[in-house]
C-alpha cells in the first residue's frame, strides 16, 4: 500500500480515537501525531514514517509513446493534452476553461481565480500545436453543439451530451492513454510536472516558474522540477567553466610587472 494511502487512513483512525478520548471511553490516543522540532528539540515521528517520493515524469522514449497513444484520441482530448502540458494546468483548471479565457492573438490563457487552487488569477501560454487544435475544436464544437461561448470542453457521452466535461472524465481519458502507451505512472498531473521541468531546462528562474505554476511557496515549485543527474552535471560544468575563466582573468593580472 502506498505511503500516502496509509497516511490518509491513519487520519481517520486518529480522529476516531480522539472522539473516544473526548467521550471518556479511552484515556489517550494511541495513534500519535508527528511534530516538527521547535526550540532545538528533535522532531517527533508519527506512527508511520512519512515518505515523500519524487513525482514521476517520462523520459523521451516514453513521452514519444504517450504522444503516439494520444494520436488515437478525439480532437477534444488531443487539445486537452496539449493545453495541460503548455499551461502546466491542474486537472480542475483544465476542465473549467471557458472559451472567453483564451486570447488567441497572443496565445494566452487567463485563468480565473475561482478555478485555481491558490484562488489567484494567472496567465499561461500555449504553443502553435495547441493554437491549431483550438481553432479546429471550436469549429467541430460549433457543428456538434451549436454554441461557442461558455465552458470549452463538452461531454460527447449519450448520457449527458453537451454538458460541461467533468474532472473524472479527463482522468479516465489519461488512464486510457497510459494503458495504450505502457506508461502506468502517467497521471493528469504528469503534464504539469513535465512542463515545469522543461521550463527549468530552458533556464527559467525559480521565481518565474513559480509564477507560471501559480505557487505561493518556492519550496512547492522545487518539488515539481526533476532535472536528471546528467542535466545537473552539465549545468555544473558550464557554471564551473565560467567561474574558472573569471578566476583566470583575475589571476592574469599577476603577470604584469608593477
Predicted stretch roles:
Residues 58-91:
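Basic, Lys/Arg- and aromatic-enriched nucleic-acid-binding interface segment
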Residues 115, 213-238:
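Catalytic-site neighborhood detector that most strongly recognizes the C-terminal catalytic loop/helix
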Residues 171-211:
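Short, basic (Lys/Arg/His-rich) helix/loop patches that form interaction surfaces
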Residues 238-258:
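C-terminal secondary-structure termini that scaffold catalytic or DNA-interacting sites
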Residues 127-183:
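Active-site/catalytic core of tyrosine-dependent DNA strand-transfer enzymes
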